[in-house]
Amino acid sequence: AGAPVYLAAXXXYLTAEILXLAGNAARDNKKSRIIPRHVQLAVXXXXXLNKLLGNVTIAQGGVLPNI
């Protein structure tokens, strides 16, 4: 078990975490499909993900409401 295994595990965990949060955002918006907007909302809402991916542009993600 080397670096590629650990890298794959970290990428799989990060993907699963983002998809779980995006699924929650889709459900909150009464949608059955995850769209890029839901991914954008999920990343921005989680503090750790926002710190990691805050400067990443998600295509068709839109802007965050600043209320």
UniProtKB/Swiss-Prot annotation:
Belongs to the histone H2A family. GO terms for molecular function: DNA binding; protein heterodimerization activity; structural constituent of chromatin. The keyword Ligase does not apply. Keywords: Chromosome, DNA-binding, Methylation, Nucleosome core, Nucleus. The modification N5-methylglutamine is found at residue 60. It is found in: Nucleus; Chromosome. SUPFAM superfamilies: Histone-fold. SMART domains: H2A. Transmembrane segments: none annotated. The keyword DNA-binding applies. GO terms for cellular component: nucleosome; nucleus. Core component of nucleosome. Nucleosomes wrap and compact DNA into chromatin, limiting DNA accessibility to the cellular machineries which require DNA as a template. Histones thereby play a central role in transcription regulation, DNA repair, DNA replication and chromosomal stability. DNA accessibility is regulated via a complex set of post-translational modifications of histones, also called histone code, and nucleosome remodeling. The nucleosome is a histone octamer containing two molecules each of H2A, H2B, H3 and H4 assembled in one H3-H4 heterotetramer and two H2A-H2B heterodimers. The octamer wraps approximately 147 bp of DNA. Gene3D superfamilies: Histone, subunit A (1.10.20.10). CDD domains: HFD_H2A. Pfam families: Histone (PF00125), Histone_H2A_C (PF16211). Its main location: nucleus. This is Histone H2A. It comes from Olisthodiscus luteus (Marine phytoflagellate).
